[in-house]
Amino acid sequence: MTTLLSIPHKQILDRRNIIKGAAALATTAVSVKAASAATAPPLGQTGAPTTASEPLPLGPLPGGRYPDSHLESAKKGPPSFGPPDFPAFAGTMAVERVATGFRWAEGPVYFAAGRYVLFSDIPNNRIMRFCEDDGHVSVYRQPSMNSNGNTIDREGRLISCEHSGRRVTRTELDGSITIIADKYNGKRLNSPNDAVVTSDGAIWFTDPIYGIGGYYEGIKAEPEQEKHNVYRVDPKSGDIKVVVDDFVEPNGIALSPDEKKLYVIDTGFTDGPNNPSQIRSFDLDVSAGKVSNSKVFADMPKPSITDGVRTDTDGRVWLSVGWGDPNEDGVRCYTPAGELLGKIHIPETVANLCFGGQQRNRLYICGSTSLYAVYTSVQGSMKP
């Protein structure tokens, strides 16, 4: 059933720029090398070349021995399997590079019906598609308005946060695009970054200024909003309201599996060394559309920051880590109480992550120029 979010600001984009449905997507599947080939920048593109460097090799990361040395538990355990409370540490789990050749991979989201991952390649102004069953990679949309974070709503529609569009959009099942939010109090948003959808259909999103700071990941512009807020879009009226206004740079956002907690990352450290590099948790009242009881869930080891966040069905919190010590690049896993369980080491700066796979236990990781994957022993909460 379509919510009234489809009513305000509806805009149909050129159908030539939209590849509709899983069947149409399949016809565009190309090799990783072909997907990274240079193309002329279409209208709205930043003009950045569509190749970054020589693609990295695919497959398991170097090491070739179980247990995979890229999986590190915070606690000591049996040498082969490790402690059971870190669900990415088991005898035959291995980190794999499944696609490469991008410029800055971000915002992965898994579509179970088609068994594919969509993710943004922000500077190249495109959304990519990784087909899980055969490993093919294709361009899902170009231009993408320098989309960053992506999620999926309860009706299976793609929700995207666009830098150069400075808006949140929804791709309808017929391929048309609806603008969900582009202004607050009559002024343009900064550059929406990441979003989640609660069970009532409300869309919650973050709005830092990263996409308007220059021409690499968007279009340089002056911010019109005084603060960098977290917003909620009402599922019935389409009204937009501020739910949190005290972040330096709100970034990744996620829900606990029971929707009683909202997690929001603050990457304010990128604006100055005295600013936070942390993730905060809030008590969430979905029906009231409000949050309360803000707490620091975890601090990152500066100068590293966390960018993306997901949860599993047991309430563990999975965070991307990068931009600081290369030894910290990767993913961190925490208990619901904020205790560090373990790390997944990735040889590139990591921006974001999502769970996917037929059993919802495969963790996909966007690491700079590549998409990585590792099987775990838990299931993602699959809350978008």
Language-model region placement:
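Asp-box/WD-like beta-propeller blade repeats and closely related beta-sheet repeat scaffolds
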Residues: 172-202, 208-218
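A short beta-strand motif characteristic of beta-propeller blades
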Residues: 96-99, 136-140, 178-184, 240-243, ...
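Blade/loop signatures of beta-propeller domains
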Residues: 51-93
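A short loop-to-beta-strand structural motif that recurs across blades of beta-propeller domains
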Residues: 126-128, 167-169, 229-231, 278-280, ...
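N-terminal secretory signal peptides
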Residues: 1-17, 24, 39-40
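Beta-rich, blade/repeat-based domains predominating
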Residues: 100-116, 143-162, 167, 185-205, ...
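Short loop/turn segments immediately following beta-strands, especially the blade-tip
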Residues: 282-289, 376-381
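Short, solvent-exposed loop/turn segments at conserved positions within beta-propeller repeat blades
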Residues: 123, 164, 213-226, 271-277, ...
